[in-house]
Amino acid sequence: MDSSANINKALTETRFSDLEPPLSGDIIEALNQSDFEFCTPVQAATIPLLCSYKDVAVDAATGSGKTLAFVVPLVEILRRSTSFPPKPHQVMGVIISPTRELSTQIYNVAQPFVSTLANVNSVLLVGGREVKADMKIIEEEGCNVLIGTPGRLSDIMERMEILDFRNLEILILDEADRLLEMGFQRQVNYIISRLPKQRRTGLFSATQTEGVEELAKAGLRNPVRVEVRAKSKSESSQQLTNSKTPSGLHLEYMECEADKKSSQLVDLLIKNSDKKLIVFFMTCASVDYWGLVLSKIPALKSISLIPIHGDMKQNARDKALASFTKASSGALLCTDVAARGLDIPGIDYVVQYDPPQDPNMFNHRAGRTARLGRQGRAIVFLLPKEEAYVEFMRIRRVPLEERKCSEDASDVIPIIRSAAMKDRAVMEKGLKAFVSFVRAYKEHHCSFIFRWKDLEIGKLAMGYGLLYLPSMSEVKQHRLSSEGFTPVEGVKFEEIKFKDKYREKQRQQNLQVRKEKRQEEKKEKGKRKRVDASASNDPKKASRKLTGKQRQTIQTAEDEEVMDRDYKLMIKVKKGLIKEDEYERLTGDDDLF
């Protein structure tokens, strides 16, 4: 079946050329060149409203084509503006989104349409690069459409008085719920305060929280609410009409022990080697570790494994994202940095190796596939004691179908451990990933399901392929189960070397420095002991060598000892064991009289 025809049929039969008020010829041509003929439901509902100068609050499923739903009307509104064409530093449109990646994506989508406007320049403003570089571009080239993250946008607006917002036509707040969740309310409020009230505003959000409602009240004027829901056949039969999962998405869960998870993941990657997957982990350290160790498994050598997370430098994230976007197959290993907003084409499978801390992120993760009417699959790995999550998600109108563990999955733990014994980088990253996961698990929003005290760290450590269990205060204090872990025998872990010769050289130098420091401390300790021994024979000399605080501490201890002795003697007097004159002699009280 022709995929494009299937997409169009699954979404809507409304063409962009059929919309009212009609779109300009330049926009229709730009849409056709990008193979956009038919609208998605959110596009068909939203574009006419914004083009009719209405404020909109849009609540749509993830993967619904929201970007074009505001980019197209933004360009149309600018074209029809009385201020068109604008002066070089006259800002007519602002688009705010929560992450650098999403802002970059919006900018790239918008470029073909903005370029249809003569003398209009759009500028991308995100963190990760020098703010002075952005200021120089704006000063020299001008800017009429600002697209970026709240932090960098507000920073530029505060610094550059040259920017003129008096004739601004339209403001777009994309992923508004995420903007608030990430703590950008102050910056968003500042940006809105700098803009004229006589403008069009579009607020796009996957969830309608109280914060989003408040933002809508403050930033929108009599908005039209647009709600677009995707509904699958299985959901219809269960009357789950409010589900936000895309209609072509097949959701599954796999229940397996912690020491079997890594083997099941490798088996899944092998069986889908010709597909494009996203694998979600809970922490940045986990992404780093699995990105390194999975590449050591011979059966995965032919599969492109690309890690990306929020702690990576911006240019590294951009490079990784571009590489995966261009690839026809492979796996993107990531944290929730890629769970929302990133519209990576052609994702076939989403794997949630670790369930998200925030259950609201589940759909955003799974929604990276089955976008724009395509078919897709998503699976979440669960431990046996986490099975209640299935019922929890069903109540939230996200039904999960069970998938059994693969019986022919090869045990990869020996391979992982072998890699750790050959390269200290693997061993150390594994320990760091394990510790970060255990601590992150404690912060689960659904702690009644993901019970930290029930975490079997022995099996978990085996699943990570650790050589030994790290010393953790959390483990010692709460006695988490270490059953199921088999430590590696006959290996001196301190002697495992880095494969990277430079890192190993640095390690050896650091070891030598620490060794010399310990020897020096040992010498100093010996000197102190000799001094203390000498001082003990000469109390006055010892007293002179002590600081005031040390003398006070010693005096307090001596006083407490005397008080304790006197109290015990007093008890003996009361019991008639000794006479009062004996008490006075022993305590020295008779010296006072």
Swiss-Prot record:
<dbReference type="Pfam" id="PF13959">
    <property type="entry name" value="CTE_SPB4"/>
</dbReference>
<feature type="short sequence motif" description="DEAD box">
    <location>
        <begin position="174"/>
        <end position="177"/>
    </location>
</feature>
<dbReference type="InterPro" id="IPR025313">
    <property type="entry name" value="SPB4-like_CTE"/>
</dbReference>
<dbReference type="InterPro" id="IPR014001">
    <property type="entry name" value="Helicase_ATP-bd"/>
</dbReference>
<feature type="compositionally biased region" description="Basic and acidic residues">
    <location>
        <begin position="506"/>
        <end position="524"/>
    </location>
</feature>
<feature type="short sequence motif" description="Q motif">
    <location>
        <begin position="16"/>
        <end position="44"/>
    </location>
</feature>
<feature type="binding site">
    <location>
        <begin position="60"/>
        <end position="67"/>
    </location>
    <ligand>
        <name>ATP</name>
    </ligand>
</feature>
<dbReference type="InterPro" id="IPR011545">
    <property type="entry name" value="DEAD/DEAH_box_helicase_dom"/>
</dbReference>
<keyword id="KW-0067">ATP-binding</keyword>
<dbReference type="GO" id="GO:0003723">
    <property type="term" value="F:RNA binding"/>
</dbReference>
<dbReference type="Pfam" id="PF00271">
    <property type="entry name" value="Helicase_C"/>
</dbReference>
<feature type="domain" description="Helicase C-terminal">
    <location>
        <begin position="264"/>
        <end position="411"/>
    </location>
</feature>
<keyword id="KW-0347">Helicase</keyword>
<dbReference type="GO" id="GO:0003724">
    <property type="term" value="F:RNA helicase activity"/>
</dbReference>
<comment type="similarity">
    <text>Belongs to the DEAD box helicase family. DDX55/SPB4 subfamily.</text>
</comment>
<dbReference type="GO" id="GO:0016887">
    <property type="term" value="F:ATP hydrolysis activity"/>
</dbReference>
<dbReference type="InterPro" id="IPR000629">
    <property type="entry name" value="RNA-helicase_DEAD-box_CS"/>
</dbReference>
<protein>
    <recommendedName>
        <fullName>DEAD-box ATP-dependent RNA helicase 18</fullName>
        <ecNumber>3.6.4.13</ecNumber>
    </recommendedName>
</protein>
<keyword id="KW-0694">RNA-binding</keyword>
<dbReference type="Pfam" id="PF00270">
    <property type="entry name" value="DEAD"/>
</dbReference>
<keyword id="KW-0547">Nucleotide-binding</keyword>
<keyword id="KW-0378">Hydrolase</keyword>
<dbReference type="InterPro" id="IPR027417">
    <property type="entry name" value="P-loop_NTPase"/>
</dbReference>
<feature type="domain" description="Helicase ATP-binding">
    <location>
        <begin position="47"/>
        <end position="226"/>
    </location>
</feature>
<dbReference type="InterPro" id="IPR001650">
    <property type="entry name" value="Helicase_C-like"/>
</dbReference>
<dbReference type="GO" id="GO:0005524">
    <property type="term" value="F:ATP binding"/>
</dbReference>
<feature type="region of interest" description="Disordered">
    <location>
        <begin position="506"/>
        <end position="561"/>
    </location>
</feature>
